[in-house]
Regions:
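Glycan-recognition and catalytic cores of secretory/periplasmic carbohydrate-active enzymes
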Residues: 1-172
Length: 172
């Protein structure tokens, strides 16, 4: 419990980890009901993120800022949903791929500066800012996201992203 926060969904990140785990479980078993639950929670996450109505505890962030962690984790769990949808919901596969493409495109277009550094935090208007949070880069996060971005590039046919992803990881 956190004083002043009476929401049950205190961390969109926690919900994302649930989706990822359940989607991968469903993909490896015969549990369509688990896939359906994961997909409903996934859709709820996308809706909350789109409306900017979500929490990131224990790492609260002002609504005036955007965290790289959001498109990063969404790219990852969307791949998990995609893999499960191959088994249970082939009509959803293209939607999942488009979502992955959007999250990776967002990261490469907005969080990577002209020098190839991937910033952890930018403004809500997709601008870099010269303060501690705005200058923060996390090489481990950058490397982890490279894995997700390379998966997306392969699945969505964006081979041209590979060079940018490699440069980002070299510079960060």
């Amino acid at each position: 419990y956190m004083e002043g926060c009476d929401r049950l969904d205190m961390s969109v990140y926690a919900d994302c980890f649930v989706v990822g785990g359940l989607a991968m479980y469903a993909a490896q078993t015969e549990t369509p009901d688990v896939y359906e639950f994961a997909k409903r929670l996934y859709d709820s996450i996308l809706d909350r993120v789109k409306r900017n109505d979500y929490q990131t505890l224990p790492y609260p962030l002002s609504k005036k800022l955007r965290a790289h962690g959001i498109p990063m984790i969404l790219s990852n769990i969307t791949k998990d949903i995609y893999q499960a949808s191959l088994k249970y919901d082939s009509d959803y596969c293209n939607t999942a791929l488009k979502n992955m493409e959007g999250f990776t495109g967002d990261t490469l277009s907005h969080f990577v500066d002209p020098d190839g550094c991937l910033h952890e935090v930018i403004t809500a208007e997709n601008q870099f800012f010269d303060q501690v949070l705005g200058n923060h880069i996390n090489p481990g996060h950058t490397l982890e996201d490279a894995w997700f971005m390379l998966d997306t590039a392969e699945l969505t046919g964006h081979a041209e992203w590979n060079e940018t992803i490699v440069i980002v990881n070299h510079e960060s």
